[in-house]
Amino acid sequence: MKTHSARKLIPIILLGLFLLIACNFPLKVLWYSPKTAPTLDPAIFGHQGTPAITLQTPGANPLNPVTTLIPFDPNTSVSYIAQSGDTLSVVAAHFDVQPEQITSPQEISSQGILPTGQQLIVPKPAGAASYPVRLLPDSAVINSPCGRDLDIAAAIQGAGGYLNSYTQVVDDETLTGTQVVKRVAENTSTNPRLLLAFIEFRSHWLTQMPESPNLTYPLSLNTPHYEGLYLELSLVAKMLNTGYYAWRQGQIRDLTFSGGGSTGISPDLNAGTAGLLYLFSQLYSQPNFEIALYGENGFMATYRNLFGDPSICDAQIGPLLTSTVQTPVLELPFAAGEVWALTGGLHLDWNTGTPAGALDFAPVTGESRCVVSRAWVLASAAGVVSRVGDGVLQLTLTDENLQPTGWEVLYMHVAGQDRTALGTHVQADERIGHPSCEGGDATGTHVHIARLYKGEWIGAGAPFPLVLSGWTAVPGEKAYQSSLIKGDQVVDSRIDGMYNSQIVR
């Protein structure tokens, strides 16, 4: 059994084409090749009425936490203040040093989340990094409580632009502009304010009525197979998530720009800013990147003009991932005594860009390959059904006082037949629906299970191992290939559900 302390970014490939039982979510095309840098649209960059944004030095950054610092030698070291979600290994990766080279006046956790505000003394990086300003807090990028409070329909209607009357057919269903934004925000767990700001920045559809709207490529991404607002906005979310979670896992230190060229980025950024930088680096050459993101009429100015200062809400809700967050106790999503198979080992929680923290289970019933199974999916913990949709059931976990804990469990490919209704409170092991092929392009009846915490997708392994009924998920060599281990028992994933992939709770 091989394990990995860190994962490389998983190549963006059509894995599902080769699997008997696999997850292909609604965004079917899983590749993206940046094109040459787009020409800056005068209609975008000539837009008036948007206040200028002033570039700040790191010391003046309002997103930097305030703390009392101890002295350090600035000739050899820098002082870094731990942020939401930081671990020692990830901070070391950002600064390109070994974990043992980092010191602190307080004890440093080697595995868990570092306390927010803890001072770390890190060897001084060689040379100055680019783009040191933290632009958006994490809560403004993922679908955190600072995103879920937004009435998307009211925001679009109040802005009075073309998006308010826009409709698009998605998977044989006619969606309004509000429904498109809501679906992308929920599917990818991306903050809807950011999505609306990006739509406005690239098309002005939020506040204006274009004479000849570009219905094929409204966001001007001009990428084959990504036509229409839904797919273009989904692609934006994928690129944003790629940067966000790569930073969260310590897998990115450089930006490579559309059209060529690269630069290192500051090691003390936050994941939200890294995600935004990555997104814009995929769309622009370096000179245009700076204008588009930082310019007087750039994206950040557009965002602030629409929604104000995101750090206000961020301060109200506090850090998202802290050292006090505990992994919830979860059960396997099926009844004791039943035989199911681990058909998909650890793979992407949702789609390209999200971490590898999901598992697939299929009931061993002898039924046809892609039917609504007679077997039942059970709730892995107590909670409230907070979202249902095409194959989707999302459970917001609650404590003994019925208060939300911040944790959520996503079940995908749950059939609409007999599915538990939105708003229903369920107990652990309560029936919530049947596994099926509904939702995306699943190639066999199964259920996909993944976790989120306050809107952030959670991978397996430290600091939040995925444990189901005492079985711990351990990664393998490739996506979908991993094991569940409980004491001396080992269950290996197999796409055909045979041999030692079968598991009894």
Ranges and model annotations:
Residues 372-422, 444-446, 450:
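Zn2+-dependent peptidoglycan hydrolase active-site motif and core
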Residues 323, 328-330, 371, 378, ...:
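Acidic, glycine-rich catalytic/binding loops that coordinate metals and/or anionic ligands
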Residues 23-83, 107, 123-142, 318, ...:
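Ser/Thr-rich, Proline-interspersed low-complexity disordered segments
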Residues 132-291:
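Catalytic glycan-binding domains that act on GlcNAc-containing polysaccharides
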Residues 33-34, 62-98, 118-120, 124, ...:
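Primarily a LysM-type cell-wall glycan-binding module
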Residues 26-29, 220-341, 481-505:
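Non-catalytic cell-wall polysaccharide-engagement segments
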Residues 322-325, 329, 340-380:
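Short glycine/threonine/proline-enriched tight-turn/helix- or strand-capping micro-motif at secondary-structure
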Residues 82, 87-105, 117, 185, ...:
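Short alpha-helical segments in extracytoplasmic peptidoglycan/chitin-binding modules
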